[in-house]
Amino acid sequence: MADSKPATLSSVAASGFLAASERVKPHTKLIALLALGHFVIDANQGALPAVLPFLKQWHGLTYAQVAMLVLAGNLTSSLIQPLFGYLSDRIARRWVLPVSIVVSGVGVALLGLAPGYAASLALVVVMGLGVASWHPEGYKTASGVAGERKATALSLFSLGGNVGIAVGAPLVTFLVAGFGSQGTLGMLVPTAIVGTLMLAAMPMITRESIPRAGGRARVRGANMPGAMAVLILVVTVRAWATLGFSTFVPFYYVDTLKADPTIVGVLLFVFLGAGALGTVIAGPIADRVGPRPFIRWVLPMSLPFGVLFLLSHGPLAFVALACFGAVLTSSFSVSVLLAQAYLPRNAGMASGLIVGFAIGLGGAGVTALGWVADRWGVPTALWISALMPLVAFAVARFLPPPRDLAAA
């Protein structure tokens, strides 16, 4: 089994994945700023699952309507990302980075003021559009300043997003518990601060997110659309499991176990926060063993923890939930790296297809889980989600090695 060497790959704004003539170090400050922007954009998105039980109570929604809100969020924040990625590959639009942060923040902040289901649905769409426009440009820009250890750098960039998703839930829960439905307006504070910082950094981002290897870089490799299709299917099934848990674990505790609704934020923080930790650990490992072998074998490793969570109670259930989130989510940024290797000429679109389209398809699966929960109960929906990594593993066996990586 040969080691993958993602460190030999670099990217530019207009053309995608590139091989540069010399090794370069990552631009640490810009990666940190982009990770901070990723934190806020995904905190806004991550607040949605925690708001859902409140919206259900305020407006008398059914589980199917709740699942439709999830679907709307994922359709707009995910499925249309390849379009933004395509536009990003053709013409760099760095101004999208600060603008998308503001748009996503406004969408989630006004949810507490929505008069009913239709208005809530519209605001979820607004939030989703901000998220969708951010990710292709953000991942491509981060890749452009990542230097030679791409898996490690992208894992740190992804850490910002994963921590944001984890923090968004308890933050909005705290705001609503303390200030009522108007508490969601508090999400505008981090949005305004980081959006302003991102806007101020635009000149530096534009200057530094070009090849810094000391010479002309050339596009390397041909696209592998068939391999990309297999990877999209793997990520779709993995996203189905992840979104299934983040959506229905709160209802499992509140409606089935009759727990206090304020525990929702803690549950999501445990699950998604552990996922953020798993992403950081995954980067250096994937740099050593290669993205394809890592993705293949990490998926079945998550299965026992999902099952253990559903069979246990108390502290053990929290530990199992954390382990399930950490292992299942660890391949997130590695999947983006492999996607960029499969589509070396379209880095923005590759990011959009994985972070957006594939995860959006997984969100469509959550709608089916909502139908299952309405008819057979929330535990059944969670059991289906817990077994999804086994399906993803079976599909991942068909992932071919990228032509320009020495992956096994």
Regions found by a protein language model. Give the residues of each.
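Helix-loop-helix hairpin linking two adjacent transmembrane segments in secondary transporters
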Residues: 157-204
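Cytoplasmic helix-loop-helix junction between adjacent transmembrane helices
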Residues: 123-160
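Structural signature of the two symmetry-related core transmembrane helices
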Residues: 95-110, 293-307, 386
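C-terminal transmembrane helical hairpin of 12-TM major facilitator-type secondary transporters
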Residues: 286-335
